[in-house]
Amino acid sequence: LIRSPEQAEAQLQEGTQDFVCLGRPQIADPNWANKALTGEGTIKRCICCLNCIESMQNNAYIGSHGECSVNPLVGHENMPLPKNGDGRTVVVIGAGPAGLCAAELLADRGFDVSLYEKKERVGGQINLAAAPPDKAKTDWFTQDAAAACLEKGVKIFTGKELSISEIKEIKPYVIILATGSAPVKPRFGGNYNPEDVYTFEDILTGRISLEGKNI
């Protein structure tokens, strides 16, 4: 899989291949070739999650299109994208995948976008998804989405939790609430200690260690 223009060019120069053909990278970023040619803009990398393959297999039975975890516009390329922001202020609260994608899309439409994240790092639960072994490429989504937002003028504030009074002072045209979800601990039958039920966040953040335990 070709990861970058630099990799493609290096393999051409080495004689490893005579030409380069892109599959999934072009789905993740349809402007891959143009960005490689001009050197402008962040190329959004395929994170090798195979959602494209799985979704095309599943959706074929219902006559629908494939999907891409990196590019939410796959299958919606003809959807109108009105440039009607006119510099109006939009506040996006939460810089997980939804918040990052919303901020970039709104900036494309001409809005003045400010993105707020109460944690010190953007990415939301993607940061947890990238934590297990061999899942580091998942973090490419966060890196590339944040870079694209900054390129398009989105102002990103981390470690900042907005109060209602602060929002009123900003007087935004629209507020996008993208604060994510909270994990639920299901109830089980039989005898068990509820305190022994942990969420994926407990484990992946290292708050709870299960080494040497029966799971």
Question: Where do the model's predicted regions map?
Answer:
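Flavin-dependent oxidoreductase catalytic cores
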Residues: 1-93, 97, 101-108, 112-113, ...
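C-terminal structured "cap/appendage" subdomains that terminate the fold
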Residues: 9-19, 26, 136, 145-146, ...
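Short beta-strand and adjacent tight-turn residues that come in two discontinuous sequence segments
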Residues: 21-22, 159, 177
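Short, contiguous acidic/charged loop-to-helix segments that flank catalytic cores in large enzymes
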Residues: 81-88, 128-140, 199-207
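Beta1-alpha1 glycine-rich phosphate/pyrophosphate-binding loop at the start
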Residues: 92-158
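A conserved short coil-to-beta-strand element within the FAD-binding core of flavoproteins
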Residues: 158-169, 185
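Glycine-/small-residue-rich beta->alpha transition segments that form the dinucleotide
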Residues: 172-174, 178-185
